[in-house]
């Protein structure tokens, strides 16, 4: 029973492989195409890849000892080398249909489609004749032709994102710069105000010391002395009467006109 199951499993795997080989259509630009198409769009028969002394990795590009159309360099469609009218070797694109089960959103752009009757400059490239390659460099690798994908990769590189840590460090540095600037400004104004206060206190102290150290003559006022002498004379004048003087009648406020005391 297990032998029958194993045989059925092998048979199903073989059928799947056969169907994948028979499937002669491409998806996208046909880099994974492994069909048996041997003619180009112009009807020319492809040359064998080994006869051109080209070295490609068969496991990745599908190039080997055959003349089937392949796309080892990422071109728009599968292609192969053919012999020109003058004996030169040139590259031509193959006319292979697109798989019908492909999603419409993944269909190639219109500018990438290749007409079946004409050949553009990108599809046809002239190379040296195959017999011009020296036999001693049979295994030498030839640089593949750059396609659309290689041209896109050579564009400007995207700037590296600093990330959250980079932005945090930038904000931290800006805050430090702002704090330093504010501290320097406040320190300048504080020192300036303290110097002005010291100058004012010094002026007040100098004026006070100058007033204290003045001589006594600076406080002498002749007018003030004259007034003081007059006052002293007036208050110090004796009120003595001579024996010849008699009090005037009625001059004493305690005496009445009749001479009666208390009147």
From Swiss-Prot:
It is a single-pass type I membrane protein. It holds the Pfam family Kringle. It is found in: Cell membrane. PROSITE patterns: KRINGLE_1, KRINGLE_2. GO terms for biological process: negative regulation of phosphatidylinositol 3-kinase/protein kinase B signal transduction. Residues 1-18 form the signal peptide. Residues 239-263 are annotated as: Disordered. Keywords: Cell membrane, Disulfide bond, Glycoprotein, Kringle, Membrane, Signal, Transmembrane, Transmembrane helix. Glycans are attached at residue 103. InterPro entries: Kringle (IPR000001), Kringle-like (IPR013806), Kringle_CS (IPR018056), Kringle_sf (IPR038178), Serine_protease_kringle (IPR050759). The chain crosses the membrane at residues 164-184. Residues 185-263 are cytoplasmic. Residues 19-163 are extracellular. Residues 24-99 form the Kringle domain. The keyword Plastid does not apply. GO terms for cellular component: extracellular space; plasma membrane. One of its GO terms (molecular function) is endopeptidase activity. Disulfide bonds join 25-99, 46-80, 69-94. Negative regulator of hepatic phosphatidylinositol 3-kinase (PI3K) activity. This is Phosphoinositide-3-kinase-interacting protein 1. The gene is pik3ip1.
